[in-house]
């Protein structure tokens, strides 16, 4: 299976990078990957390209907290389906449940869920792949997105007191005045934050009233989840190729590079 993420998220991140003074096209050109920010937002991009782009942009900006900076400019609520799900939730607990389902539907190979404990509910994210150099910015980006969903009910000043980050650490966090005395642990495949149960009945509100993302006339969650990335190599490659077609048919070498395979090995796989 080829892990994919929605191009719409890449577009939001690319816009945030431009606002932070980083040239999106310069980063993509340096990395030798397609300009996904110019593709159909309804299409899909490899998760690996998304990760490499954030890391490359962080190096261009010379920032150790670039993952947080991107998420602050392009808040999780700018994804219209997430914003509308939060808006229709009766309380923070319902918003967290919906957000987990929608964020999982936004990519494959990644699982989101709520882990119920006696004093807190943990928002958890599991990735099948082990971390590599440069993934710190992606983990920052993921952590900030989780926190922003909770802030819709707890207020913008809220920060988790217990955090689990994927990797072996250390991963840079905002200054102490923002993160407080949070207890941070590391796990090989999971990132998570603890939300106190006292916050769960809180009503939710938007923290991004000036979002430039247009509000959809209707929100159809089942349809959205049915269009999640394909779970087989051939189907995933079809989705990628369709996304890239407006810019010309990609070569087998380009597709193989995206899939992380040798062109001949990919051809043999497709012939089977």
Regions found by a protein language model. Name each.
Residues 1-12, 19, 115, 120, ...:
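Surface-exposed, interaction-prone regions with an acidic/low-complexity signature
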Residues 1-123, 145:
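N-terminal low-complexity or simple alpha-helical regulatory segments
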Residues 11, 93, 136-144, 209, ...:
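Short, well-ordered alpha-helical segments
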Residues 25-26, 137, 250:
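Short, solvent-exposed positions on alpha-helices
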Residues 30-34, 166, 258:
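Short acidic/histidine-centered micro-motifs embedded in hydrophobic/aromatic stretches
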Residues 46, 76-199:
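N-terminal regulatory/effector-sensing and dimerization cores
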Residues 54, 96, 143-146, 219, ...:
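Hydrophobic alpha-helical core bundles mediating ligand binding, dimerization, or RNAP-core interactions
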Residues 169-272:
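Extended mid-to-C-terminal alpha-helical interaction segments
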